Design a protein with these regions (language model features):
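Terminal amphipathic alpha-helical/low-complexity segments used for targeting or macromolecular assembly
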Residues: 1-62, 180-191
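Conserved catalytic segment of ABC-fold P-loop ATPases
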Residues: 154-157, 170-172
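Acidic, glycine-centered active-site loop in nucleotide-sugar glycosyltransferases
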Residues: 169-171, 176-179
Length: 191
């Protein structure tokens, strides 16, 4: 029936196997490359942020993204209010990447949603899939943090420089290492 007629884009954002060379996805990717190039060459940060606001799935009113941004599509990125990112932010958004209010992202951080089949024949066939990344409010990532596909983080999470976050964690924790683990609980004042 009609339910079987999902587009490759719909399959992709749902985390189902999809063909990345689908014409609709190629066109979306090409548009993203053009916007990425325009943003990365823009010297005026106000103009740069207008590009991001008109491109990403959603953003807060107040945000700052430094240049050397790399994304797959951009349209699957949802940022809360007061988002800040330093240089070289990579967000590979084949599935949605959602980050809550007041995020501070250090340089060279990567948010990676794409996955490939482990079986070599399946992988070589070109089929891909992904898993979304969802992060709560008040996230602080030091330099070089990597967040892998399918990770959900709660509120008030701090990730130390170089942390590789391979699985989900709750609220009020400091993560460090590869693979990242909780090295400290954060005592939060009751409002």
């Amino acid at each position: 029936g009609y339910q079987d007629m999902k587009s490759e884009y719909q399959k992709m954002i749902a985390g189902e196997p999809y063909h990345p060379f689908d014409p609709e996805l190629r066109a979306l990717s090409q548009t993203a490359r053009q916007k990425q190039a325009t943003f990365n060459e823009e010297v005026d940060p106000v103009k740069g942020l207008e590009i991001i606001k008109g491109w990403f799935g959603s953003t807060g009113e107040n945000l700052y993204v430094n240049t050397r941004l790399v994304v797959d599509y951009g349209v699957n990125i949802y940022l809360g209010e007061n988002f800040y990112s330093n240089w070289n932010l990579t967000m590979l958004d084949v599935c949605p990447i959602t980050i809550g209010d007041n995020a501070m992202i250090g340089p060279n951080c990567q948010f990676l949603t794409p996955l490939h089949p482990l079986d070599p024949d399946e992988r070589n066939s070109g089929i891909e899939f992904g898993k979304p990344i969802t992060i709560g409010k008040n996230f602080w990532a030091g330099g070089g943090v990597i967040v892998l596909p399918g990770v959900t983080l709660g509120d008030n999470v701090v990730a130390g420089a170089g942390a590789v976050i391979t699985k989900s964690f709750g609220d009020n924790v400091v993560l460090a290492g590869n693979p990242a683990r909780v090295i400290k609980e954060i005592p939060v004042k009751e409002n």
